[in-house]
Every structure is written in C-alpha cells, then in structure tokens.
C-alpha cells in the first residue's frame, strides 16, 4: 500500500467534498419547478415545449400512486422502444459494420438492463451494436433512467420535508428538468473534456490493421446466429483461430461515456469498458470519471439537508457514506496489494496484477472497483473476476448492501433513507419512545414499506441465484467450480437486482436462460423496490410534524452516525452472510491453503 496511493485517495476525497455543496445547491434549483438556473434562457423554452407536446400540466402535482404509475408507464414504453430498435437494427441507419438484428432473448436482456439503469451487458458492444443502437437505443436510457432515479429521490425528500400534504411532486416535471438542466449540460462539458484526453467521437467505419505477427487465440465456438455452442457435458466448446487482422473500433464514444459515468449507468461502448484506452485514455480521465460517478449522489445528501432545513443531518449521512466507502476501498486495496498466496509460496513477490491495466495499477483498480459498486454504476477499469477472494468480496458486498454508499443517481439516497427510517425506529425501541424522524412519527406501515424494499432485493438475488445453482441451465454457464463458481453466480444476480451491471465475467451469461432470468432480476430489483419506497413517501408526506423535545432522538452527530452504520451493516449484510461465507470467504481460506478454482 504505497504512499502514492494514499495521496491519490486523499485527492479523491477532497475533490468529492469540494463538489458536494455546489452540486447540492444546483440540484435544489433544478428540482424546484420554479427554480432558476444559468441555462434558463436556452432551456426554458425547450422545457415548456416538451410539456406541451407531452400534454403535461407542470403545475399539477402527483400523489405517490400517480407518481408511481407515471414512472412505471414511462419505463415500460422506453423498454419496448429499445427492444424494437435492437430487433430491427439491421434495417436502421448508422450501421457501417452491417451488424444484424439482436437475438430476442439478448434484446430483452439489454432493453431491461438499460431501462433499469443496470447496463448489464451479455454482448460486446463493438461487435454487436450499430452506432444508431448505441446512441438512440442505449444512450437515451442512460439519460432518462438516471433522471428517473433522481426524480424518485426528490419525491421522497419532498415527502420528508412537507407535512400534512398529499403530493410529492410531478414525475414528468422532475424527469424533464433533471434531463435538461442537470444531465445534458454537464455531459456536454464532460464529453468535450474526454475528447481532449484522447477519447474518440466520430461516425467512421472501423479501422482495419494488419498484424505484424499473426497470433493464435482460443475463442468460444459459435453458430451462424452468434450463439455459443455447448458440448454433451454442457460446457462451452472452444476453438483455436489465427488472427492476422485487427478491427480498431470507432464511433460516438465520448458522448456515451460521459452520461455512462455521470448517470451511474456503466455500460461500456466496448467490451473492455473503462480499461480500454479509448474509453479511459489517461490517469486524469480515470480520476474525473470516478468523481463523476459519485458527484450527483454526493450532492443529493446536501440537497437532503437543505430541503429538511437540517444541514447537519445531510452532512452526517454524507460522512456515514464516506466511512463505509473507506472501509471498502482499504480492504480491497490491501487484499490486492497482498497478492495471491499461491504465488508467494512459489517465490513470486508483488501484489495481484491479474486482470488489471498496468497503467492504472493495483490502487486505481481497487479504488475504481469500490467506487463503481458503491454507486450502481458497474463500469470497470479492471476485471473483478480476477481479484483475490477478499478483493472480489468488496464489490460483491457493496452491491448487496443496496449500493447506498452514494449509490446510483437518486437510488443511493432513497436506499440510504430506508436505512435512516429503520435506524430511528430501532433507536425509538431502545429508549421506549415512539420513533420519530425529523418530527414525523415512524409507524408500523412505514417500517413495513422500508423492510419490504430491502426484502425484495434479497429475495431477487438469493432466489434467482439458488435457481441457477440447482438448474442445469444455470450451471451450464459456469467455467469455474467450487466457491468461485458460486461467487460468479451470486455476483451476476446481485449485479442485476442491484442495478449495477458489472460482472465476474467467468460466467457465460449470453444464453436464453441467463438472458431471461437476469432480465427479470433487473426489473424486479428496480421497480418492485421503488414501489414500496414511494408508498413510504406517500405515508410520510401526510404526517404532521411534532415539535422537538428533550427526548427527541437527534438525526445528526456521532450517536446517529454509529446507529446508521450499524443498521446498514446488520440489516443489509446479514441477509447475505451465509451465501458470502460459502463463496468468497471460503475461497479466501482455500486459496491460503494452496487451492485454486
């Protein structure tokens, strides 16, 4: 754990702290329908025109049921829209490589993935999708799925801030304003910055380069439809090919990568994602991309404090998130720096560099892995499947917590607020008082909705993983046995339900069974979790505020900080402890004993 790593970690944390307040203040203006921003002269006419085209009355707010219905309807239409584009790709423009239509099961998986802000990819973008599909089918969802998450967080915060009311905002207004005033302007500047660092942005056909020395590679055997071929034992067949030419990818990459990071989407333009030199050219681009992943989630904690008129509460939530983040990044960094025990027994010194870009090294790989799984981003600059057992445990555990450490844009805050409600409920039980949160009584219905959202996540992950483990279709995708194979399955369904999108890529997921189950897993983890959270918002907004007294439990300071972290670790982690013990924990001890999988 070198000094340079500590310096880079300090720079990252200082930069994150510095952008939190400005981002929070700007979010407050964006999420206020009457708020004014620098972009009003240009964007206000566009905003009003959008409302007219959509037939939306921006002055009419929704109750929680109307808000939920609008969100579900919009997401359904968007999912079908993307599915149709992928199925008709061969008839659509901007397809210089002449890619064919995407298979039905893969098209469903991809449409569900990008609709839910997951961006799980059972395909390689550079060999499957046209420029039109990338821009219109996927980048569209990168914007609106991120805006949807921020809108839901805003609705919950309004419900906490208001009292004796019925409405939590207008979903369509929140969606439009977040997209126009927050995501588009920042992404425009961000994309120009990425181009300045060396990222490509064009519509050229792929460049063909002849290799000086042809090379032999082993690849999965596929049929004419691009589907992998299985042997009699259910394993994927491998064939040897000689490669004499290389296709160098081109296309509108910078514009997609900007929103991919800022919107915590994570889906790579190319299969190698942020480890590819086109998607992440320099150390500076690497740092800025990591900061952009946390930027909106961090700013939302300040927005929370401002809206409830208790800025100390917002900062306490922020500090709790940073503390959990530091715990993860330090464990992952230590595990990867310690290296593989089997290599050490053979006299090979050094940390674990397998699956990592030499230009990023161990620290930046560990930091990026922690950031991308604390948020529901899923972009990677290294291969998580190649991490040590404990190093891989960290991203898996982060996802299973619900990615509430800054989290996906919006999703991180509303996920953490669920734990806040449970924390004050536990505090009330311990002191024998009716639990209160910012003057509002937390009753049985509120706790049920909070717990239901957490149980849906756990059931989606563990239920689908259990099905995969006992079914021939699930086991057919495994290329590793033992605890590591279990970890790969757990990671896949955790990533799906948690709307993360990263993977332990040793699992062959592009099969009809995995495409279907992972697609359902993503939809359940996104929308079935959001409904009880909005129901909680509907309950909180109707409550009266009780004046604070000497016995009121404060929602800022050290006591609340400790209770919140304890609630996150106890309730969030205990659901998955048995499965984690059988996966990465057992693998760690077996690796130390000299056994690999």
Where are these regions (language model features)?
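Membrane-proximal intracellular helices of multi-pass ion channels
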Residues: 2-597
């Amino acid at each position: 754990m070198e000094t340079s790593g500590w310096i880079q970690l300090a720079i990252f944390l200082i930069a994150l702290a510095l952008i939190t307040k400005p981002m929070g203040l700007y979010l407050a203006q964006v999420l206020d329908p009457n708020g004014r921003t620098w972009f009003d002269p240009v964007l206000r006419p566009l905003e009003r025109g959008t409302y007219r085209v959509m037939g939306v009355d921006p002055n009419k707010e929704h109750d929680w049921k109307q808000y939920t219905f609008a969100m579900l309807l919009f997401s359904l239409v968007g999912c079908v829209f993307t599915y149709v584009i992928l199925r008709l790709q061969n008839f659509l423009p901007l397809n210089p490589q002449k890619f064919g239509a995407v298979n039905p099961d893969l098209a469903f998986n991809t449409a569900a993935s990008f609709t839910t802000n997951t961006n799980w990819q059972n395909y390689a973008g550079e060999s499957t999708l046209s420029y039109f599909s990338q821009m219109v089918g996927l980048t569209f969802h990168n914007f609106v799925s991120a805006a949807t998450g921020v809108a839901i967080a805003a609705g919950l915060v309004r419900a906490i801030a208001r009292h004796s009311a019925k409405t939590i905002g207008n979903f369509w207004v929140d969606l439009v304003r977040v997209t126009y005033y927050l995501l588009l302007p920042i992404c425009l500047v961000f994309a120009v910055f990425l181009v300045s660092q060396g990222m490509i942005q064009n519509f050229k056909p792929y460049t063909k380069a002849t290799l000086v020395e042809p090379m032999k590679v082993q690849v999965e055997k596929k049929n004419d439809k691009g589907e992998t071929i299985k042997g009699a034992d259910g394993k994927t067949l491998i064939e040897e090919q000689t490669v004499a030419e290389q296709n160098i990818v081109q296309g509108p990459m910078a514009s997609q990568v900007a929103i991919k990071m800022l919107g915590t989407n994570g889906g790579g333009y190319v299969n190698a994602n942020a480890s590819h030199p086109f998607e992440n050219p320099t150390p500076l681009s690497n740092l800025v991309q990591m900061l952009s992943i946390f930027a909106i989630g961090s700013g939302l904690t300040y927005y929370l404090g401002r809206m409830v008129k208790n800025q100390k509460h917002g900062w306490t939530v922020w500090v709790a998130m940073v503390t959990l983040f530091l715990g993860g990044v330090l464990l992952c960094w230590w595990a990867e720096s310690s290296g593989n025990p089997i290599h050490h027994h053979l006299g090979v010194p050094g940390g674990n560099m397998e699956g990592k870009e030499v230009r990023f090294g161990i620290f930046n790989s560990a930091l990026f892995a922690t950031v991308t799984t604390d948020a529901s981003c899923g972009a990677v600059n290294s291969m998580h499947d190649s991490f040590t057992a404990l190093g891989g445990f960290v991203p898996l555990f982060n996802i299973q917590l619900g990615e509430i450490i800054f989290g996906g844009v919006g999703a991180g805050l509303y996920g953490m607020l669920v734990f806040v409600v449970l924390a004050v409920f536990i505090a009330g039980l311990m002191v024998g008082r009716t639990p209160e949160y910012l003057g509002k009584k937390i009753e049985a219905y509120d706790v049920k909705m909070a717990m239901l959202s957490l149980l849906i996540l756990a059931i989606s992950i563990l239920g689908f993983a259990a099905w995969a483990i006992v079914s021939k279709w699930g086991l057919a995708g495994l290329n590793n046995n033992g605890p590591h194979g279990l970890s790969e399955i757990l990671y896949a369904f955790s990533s799906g339900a948690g709307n993360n999108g990263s993977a332990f890529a040793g699992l062959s997921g592009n099969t009809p069974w995995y495409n279907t189950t992972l697609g359902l897993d993503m939809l359940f983890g996104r929308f079935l979790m959001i409904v009880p959270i909005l129901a909680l918002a509907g309950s909180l907004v109707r409550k009266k505020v009780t004046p604070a007294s000497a016995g009121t439990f404060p929602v800022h300071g050290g006591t609340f900080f400790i209770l919140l972290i304890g609630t996150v670790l106890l309730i969030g982690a205990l659901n998955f402890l048995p499965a984690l013990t059988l996966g990465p924990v057992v693998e760690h001890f077996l690796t130390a004993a000299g056994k690999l999988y």
